[in-house]
């Protein structure tokens, strides 16, 4: 605990209560009389790692969505409900990662099969 209340690392993007470091994830104010447990509960919102059950639900939703894309020739409009389920089951950062990973895996699959066609700008250079 810092001299004026809970001390949290600025390198992690959070606040030192008395000095005014802030994070947009805080749900309330942190003053000199804020108990450490209260201040930490503000920080913990949205920060906890998913449990094993939550990870399994996320991966299952991702797999169902990817399967739908495969079955519908990448037509995302046919998989809107599964996309919504995927987005509500996984942390946003994971969704970005999984989307990029799928793009890479599809590119790699085409490249290894000799089906990769460079864009016109790449072919001209």
From Swiss-Prot:
**Where is the major localization of this protein?**
mitochondrion
Entry keywords, A to Z: Acetylation, Disease variant, Disulfide bond, Mitochondrion, Primary mitochondrial disease
Q: Where is the CHCH domain?
A: 55-98
Give GO terms for biological process.
mitochondrial ATP synthesis coupled electron transport; mitochondrial cytochrome c oxidase assembly; respiratory chain complex IV assembly
Q: Where in the cell is it found?
A: Mitochondrion intermembrane space
State the disulfide connectivity. Answer: 58-90, 68-79
Checking InterPro entries in the record gives: COA6, COX6B-like, CX6/COA6-like_sf
Q: Which Pfam families match?
A: COX6B
Give the function comment from the record.
Involved in the maturation of the mitochondrial respiratory chain complex IV subunit MT-CO2/COX2. Thereby, may regulate early steps of complex IV assembly. Mitochondrial respiratory chain complex IV or cytochrome c oxidase is the component of the respiratory chain that catalyzes the transfer of electrons from intermembrane space cytochrome c to molecular oxygen in the matrix and as a consequence contributes to the proton gradient involved in mitochondrial ATP synthesis. May also be required for efficient formation of respiratory supercomplexes comprised of complexes III and IV.
Q: Oligomeric state and partners?
A: Interacts with COA1. Found in a complex with TMEM177, COX20, MT-CO2/COX2, COX18, SCO1 and SCO2. Interacts with MT-CO2/COX2 and SCO2. Interacts with SCO1. Interacts with COX20 in a MT-CO2/COX2- and COX18-dependent manner. Interacts with COX16.
The entry's protein name is Cytochrome c oxidase assembly factor 6 homolog
- Native organism is Homo sapiens (Human)
State the gene name recorded for this protein: COA6
